[in-house]
Each structure stands twice: as C-alpha cells, then as structure tokens.
C-alpha cells in the first residue's frame, strides 16, 4: 500500500534554526523534496574517506580494531593516511615512468650520460644516430663526414659523429638521456622500497576501517544536515521549511511541534505536484519484493499502484519457469538453508530465495526436469509428480512433443492474458472510485486483450478459432478506447470525446502492441526450453567420457550446469522482470518514476 502524504510548512524563530533542525532530525519523519547542495567541505571529505576505504579494502587481513578512534585521534590518523596515500601514488607513478624509461634505454645498453656530457664540455660535441644500411654505407663513403660505427641497436646501424650530420641524410638522432640505465635501475629499486614501506603502513591502517566507516557515516549525516539547513528560507527574523510527512505520522508531528513551539500549516499535495515521495507499506508477504526493487532501483510514483503482491506472484512463477529445473531449485534451496543456518536468521533476501527455490522445484517436478536428465523419469516417484502434457520428456507419457510444446505455449499466453487483464481490472476499479469515465476505455482494453488471446492461439498454435466474433470484440474494444480514452474528471464529455478521437491512430497502434505483448510471454517457454537443451548437451558430453576421464566428465558437469544456472539467472532479470516492469506496468500506465520517501534523520548506515 502506498501511504498518503501531507505537505507541511514549518515556521520558527530564526534564532531557533539550529534547534529546529536538531528536533526535525530527531523526529525523523519529514521528507524534504528539493534540497539545496550540502556544504562543499562535507562532500569533499566524504569523497576522500570513500577513496581511503576503497584503497584499504585491498590491504585487509589483520584483525580490525575493537575500539573506534575518537574524533581527535581520527584527525591525526586521517592526515597521516592521506599523506601516505599521496606518497604511495607518487611513488607508483614514478616507478612506472622509470620502468618505461629503462625499457626504452635497455637496448642501448649500460652507459653513462654524464660522461658523454663531460666530453661535450671538453669540446667534443658527440651525436649518436640510427639509420638504415644504405645510408650508413653512404656516410662511411662520404669524405666530408667523419662517423664512428657503433654496435647495432634494434638491428639498425648505429653511428656516432663529432657534431651534427648534414641535413640530407635520413637519420634518427638518439637524444642523450638525463640518467643512464644503472641510475634508472637504482631509482626503480628506491621507488619499490618506498612503495613497500607505504604498503606496510596501509596494511596497518586497514585495521581502522571501522573508524573510517564511522567517520563516513558522520560526514554523510553532517552533509545532509547542511543540505537541509541550506534549503531553509528566512526573512524578518523567521525561518521556515516545507516538506512531506506520511498521513499516519501527522499526530506525532503535531505533538512535537507543540512541544517545540513551531508554527505550522498542513495540506494535501497539489494534483500537479510531482515531487511527492512514495512510501510503500509492505506486509509480511510483499516485503519479500524489497530486495528485488532495491536491486532494480525502481519506485512507483506517488499516484501509481503498489503492485508488490502481484509482482511477487508473477515474478515467482516466471522465475520457476525460466530456471525450469527442479535440480537447480534444490541447489537454491540448499543455499538458502546454509545462509539461514549461518546467520541464525533468514533475511528478507534469503526468505525470497526460499520461495523462489520451492517454486522452481515445484515447476521442475511438474515438467519432469531434474538436472536435464531423462533418466529421472525412470524413478517412479519423480514420474508420478509430472503433468503429462507439461512433461519435457513427453514420450514417457505417450504424449506427442508437439502437443506438449503447444500446451506450454498456451499456458504462457494464458499467463500473459491474465496479467494484462488484471491490469485493466485494476484501472477500472480505481477509475470507478474516482468517477472517471475513462474506465470504459479500460473495459475496451480488457475486451480487446481477451479477444486477441484467441488470435494468438490461432496464429501460433494453429488452434481452430471462430475469428468473426473475435474480430467483433476487438473492434468493439477499439471503439470504446477511442470514444472514452480521452475522458477525465476535469473535462467535459465533448472535450474528452474530441481528445479520444484525436488519438484514434495511436490507439490502433496500441492495439497491435497489445497483441505483441501477449505474444511476448512466449519468452517463458523459449528460455526454459533453451535452458533444458543446454543442460542436456552438457550431460551428453559428460556421459561420453569413460574410465580415467570421469574426472573430466565431472568438471564438464560442474562447469556446464554452473554456466546454465548463471545464464538462467540473467534471463530472469532480462525476461522475468521485463514482463512485470514493461508489459504489466505499461498496461497499468505505471512509469516507475517515483521518489523514494527519505526522511531527514540521523542515519545508522551509510546511504549508497
């Protein structure tokens, strides 16, 4: 359920601004929609602390500190660590540059640039060149040029001359470096020693990661406090703030306001207010969807539906059909059991894993799929659990494979039709309550979708359907959508009719899209069959190995089924989630563009 919100305006004396902010943060129920930027110093410090935390994660291993550093102690630690990180970074960059210079110089061998420069001071302007064999021969034959032949460098003739060579000759001069190879190697070793010293300090500093996390939390809280402070407005000795509070918290706010002597005003959000936050109230069942919504980062709009219950139901079924293997479900169940026993309590995510595991086992048992093994049907107990027309090995039940495939596809289309029809019914119910005449358009969509289901069966499965009444229902639904789709409580009948007729072509395209939406549920069948085929392929590969090669067979099974599980989980995200977020939500008119309710309070966890 999406909780109702109230807009609240809070006014206090400007001299009481700090007390106002402190009390509001302690109250922890007011959401501020458009906050100003936090103070730059807090943002910069949080960024630096985040960099420290990320770097020190690479140096963990020692037992973490048991007592957090005090703020004063942490400041000393912070400055030392920042200096160490800067020194470590500079040494790494220097080491990389020295290594690159040494690589470039290595083919020239060990020599002393200082000695070459000293010769220059004595009047010997030595230049070193590389060139091709033809040019080298020409230079040697030129009586006006004096060159000394050196050992080839990089398989190219190398020459030395007193003074620069004449311009016409195509040669590449070797610039005398500042440091020789020996000096560079010594510098590289010095950098390496310095880096090891820094890394020892970083290993020791990693013990204080809990203190860094604590300071990150404090800094984030300070940043939010400053943002709310900067958001407040003041004039004539007064300071005020505007935010949102859940309707269920109104009495608690009134009590706090009376104690603090605030002036306040409260009202319902305006119809065009798109900054109203969404607070979803979950029950014991729907809260299982929280991990999925958190991963996807989606929040329903304030005026949209809370579809957590329906999302959970369909998502569970889609997950089971896409994974499709009871053996994999048993592995998921085992993982859920291990995590529950390890933590001595099942988190919301683990509880969801329990549900998905059981659903996968049930679906796999009904289709007779156990690690893709056809031999599983030789076990009487497992065979007795199978619905013959759903069986992935229909020959064991005297069912033709075409009949089995058509049955599964038909089941997928039924799921799609039911889910999309449910969306229409939900829209009708809401609009009837709002006295919105456009509910008739949703009734038209309901009729059209249910009729299009038979068109899908006719085209995909080849089922005999009387198309005349189906076409009549689709046309009737289309007309209802065109005539009443533009209606709304703030329009006259004529205005709504005009708007609906103006969208007639769009409605025509949307009707075709509705047909495609039902068709898209065939992905549940296709992905499930692909997963089964992959499992069977790896099984056949593994069973072909005999004798000492059994170890290779085991590796093939582990890698193959592991890969299949990973691909199945990715398919759940790509296909199972899509059907809920696009097809179902699209029919509901949901955009998932809500703003999560995020009240101003002192946090005990770092906000991502």
Identify the residue ranges that each predicted region occupies.
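Conserved, carboxylate-rich catalytic/transport cores that coordinate ions
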Residues: 1-6, 18-32, 251-608
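Long, charged N-terminal accessory/stalk domains
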Residues: 1-310, 339, 346-350
């Amino acid at each position: 359920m999406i909780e109702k919100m109230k807009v609240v305006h809070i006014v206090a004396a400007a001299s009481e601004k700090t007390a106002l902010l402190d009390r509001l943060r302690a109250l922890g129920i007011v959401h501020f929609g458009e906050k100003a930027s936090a103070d730059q110093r807090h943002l910069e410090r949080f960024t630096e602390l985040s960099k420290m935390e990320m770097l020190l994660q690479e140096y963990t291993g020692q037992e973490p500190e048991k007592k957090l550093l005090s703020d004063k102690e942490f400041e000393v630690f912070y400055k030392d660590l920042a200096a160490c990180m800067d020194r470590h970074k500079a040494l790494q960059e220097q080491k990389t540059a020295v290594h690159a210079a040494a690589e470039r110089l290595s083919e020239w061998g060990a020599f002393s640039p200082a000695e070459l420069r000293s010769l220059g001071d004595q009047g010997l302007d030595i230049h070193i060149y590389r060139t091709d064999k033809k040019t080298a021969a020409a230079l040697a034959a030129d009586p006006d040029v004096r060159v000394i032949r050196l050992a080839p460098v990089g398989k190219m003739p190398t020459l030395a001359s007193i003074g620069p060579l004449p311009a016409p000759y195509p040669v590449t001069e070797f610039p005398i470096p500042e440091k020789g190879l020996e000096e560079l190697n010594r510098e590289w070793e010095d950098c390496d020693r310095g880096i090891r010293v820094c890394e020892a300090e970083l290993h020791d500093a990693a013990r204080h990661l809990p203190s860094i996390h604590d300071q990150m939390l404090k800094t984030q809280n300070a940043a939010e406090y400053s943002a709310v402070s900067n958001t407040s407005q003041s004039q004539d000795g007064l300071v005020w703030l505007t935010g949102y509070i859940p309707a269920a918290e109104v009495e608690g706010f009134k009590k706090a306001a009376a104690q603090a002597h605030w002036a306040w005003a409260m009202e319902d959000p305006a119809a065009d207010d798109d900054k109203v936050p969404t607070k979803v109230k979950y029950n014991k069942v729907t809260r299982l969807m929280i991990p999925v919504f958190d991963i996807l980062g989606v929040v329903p709009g304030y005026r949209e539906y809370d579809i957590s219950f329906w999302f959970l139901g369909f998502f569970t079924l889609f997950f089971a059909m896409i994974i499709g293997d009871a053996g994999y479900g048993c592995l998921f169940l085992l993982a859920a059991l291990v995590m529950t026993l390890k933590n001595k309590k099942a988190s919301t995510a683990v509880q969801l894993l329990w549900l998905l595991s059981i659903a996968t086992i049930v679906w796999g048992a009904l289709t007779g799929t156990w690690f893709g093994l056809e031999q599983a049907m030789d076990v009487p107990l497992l065979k007795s659990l199978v619905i013959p027309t759903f069986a992935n090995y229909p020959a064991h039940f005297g069912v033709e494979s075409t009949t089995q495939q058509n049955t599964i596809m038909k089941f997928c289309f039924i799921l799609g039709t039911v889910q999309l029809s449910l969306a229409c019914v939900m829209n009708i119910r809401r609009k009837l309550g709002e006295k919105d005449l456009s509910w008739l358009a949703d009734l038209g969509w309901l009729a059209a979708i249910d009729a299009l289901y038979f068109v899908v069966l006719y085209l995909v499965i080849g089922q005999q359907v009387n198309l005349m009444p189906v076409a009549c229902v689709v046309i009737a639904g289309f007309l209802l959508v065109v005539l009443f789709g533009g209606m709304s409580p703030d329009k006259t009948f004529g205005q709504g009719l005009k708007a609906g007729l103006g969208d007639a072509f769009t409605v025509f395209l949307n009707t075709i899209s509705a047909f495609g939406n039902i068709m898209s549920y065939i992905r549940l069948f296709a992905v499930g069959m692909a997963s089964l085929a992959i499992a069977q392929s790896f099984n056949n590969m593994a069973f072909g190995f005999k004798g000492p090669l059994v170890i290779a067979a085991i590796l093939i099974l582990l890698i193959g089924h592991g890969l299949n599980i990973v691909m199945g989980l990715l398919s759940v995200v790509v296909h199972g989630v899509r059907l809920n977020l696009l097809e179902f939500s699209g029919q509901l008119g949901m955009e998932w563009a809500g703003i999560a309710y995020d009240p101003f309070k002192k946090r005990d966890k770092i906000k991502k």
